[in-house]
Amino acid sequence: MEKKSVPNSDKLSLIRVLRGIICLMVLVSTAFMMLIFWGFLSAVVLRLFSIRYSRKCVSFFFGSWLALWPFLFEKINKTKVIFSGDKVPCEDRVLLIANHRTEVDWMYFWDLALRKGQIGNIKYVLKSSLMKLPLFGWAFHLFEFIPVERRWEVDEANLRQIVSSFKDPRDALWLALFPEGTDYTEAKCQRSKKFAAENGLPILNNVLLPRTKGFVSCLQELSCSLDAVYDVTIGYKTRCPSFLDNVYGIEPSEVHIHIRRINLTQIPNQEKDINAWLMNTFQLKDQLLNDFYSNGHFPNEGTEKEFNTKKYLINCLAVIAFTTICTHLTFFSSMIWFRIYVSLACVYLTSATHFNLRSVPLVETAKNSLKLVNK
């Protein structure tokens, strides 16, 4: 099934277009104000004192903003998100691996994370080119998403360095990784099959061959502080949605998400064995998707309930109210200091994202140094 980057015109109407534009304007404007005010204060200023409490604040404030997306998908667009497989606990620190059907798969992780109270703690390994997106590049940087060039000789040291900073078991963590390295298309699948045939690897029809090095590195760095690995399989019954399909609410009508919770004791320790384990996992995923396309559903559906509409409607209204107040103070009030602050924050976030700069926890470092001296 090929990815289409244009919306399905058969279902597109003027009402959907207007609703989509309004929703997108709300999401972009709220993102800007949350990044400028709470993002700068919690991820930059507070980080000078404590990385741990900085991450807690980022998780809270941006979890509130990210919750707008599942609300858009499920309550406004009426997309049915159907979960199946293992019922997962709320408190797990996990590494998630998933197939990559289309450009918006990663957004549906938020629907599961919201139900588990982890939406502010989810991080992704993503293409470095996405860090250049206006506004959203700032968000990816402040959320501590991990950019990769998809060239291992360049990525290994950077990946291990960033992932190792997530080792503290006191910090909540959902680290998401797409081992295929790119989204699925028929053309890519044919190239994957050709490579598999030439190298004696399994022939997969519904997924691409996984790239193992990133997964191995993440697992090795975090194994002592993880509770589990979640093997997530995403299926769409009809057309794979594009970003614009999501915005206009025309696709998908249903998203099926199957979760297999894997204890770390079930995963080998040696790199060669981990590679084989991941390859076998994608063979199982390929068969699971084959059955899904035949039957129209995954086994053991209905493991998660709908989220509380009232609770997240109040959350949406609170985020919009905060944005309205900040917009007024910045652009329409006589307080010039707000405009100066916003300008400086924009300059800093642009520079920090481009050069990958982060605040050094000076106070925390000084305290640790004093402890060592006193010993």
Curated annotation (Swiss-Prot):
Main location (coarse class): membrane
CDD domains per record: LPLAT_LCLAT1-like (cd07990)
Catalysed reaction equations from the record: a 1-acyl-sn-glycero-3-phosphate + an acyl-CoA = a 1,2-diacyl-sn-glycero-3-phosphate + CoA
Pathway: Phospholipid metabolism; CDP-diacylglycerol biosynthesis; CDP-diacylglycerol from sn-glycerol 3-phosphate: step 2/3
Bilayer topology term: Multi-pass membrane protein
Keyword tags: Acyltransferase, Lipid biosynthesis, Lipid metabolism, Membrane, Phospholipid biosynthesis, Phospholipid metabolism, Transferase, Transmembrane, Transmembrane helix
Cellular-component GO terms for this entry: membrane
GO biological process: CDP-diacylglycerol biosynthetic process
Motif (HXXXXD motif) on chain: 100-105
GO MF entries: 1-acylglycerol-3-phosphate O-acyltransferase activity
Family classification: Belongs to the 1-acyl-sn-glycerol-3-phosphate acyltransferase family.
Stated name of the protein: Probable 1-acyl-sn-glycerol-3-phosphate acyltransferase 5
Organism per entry: Arabidopsis thaliana
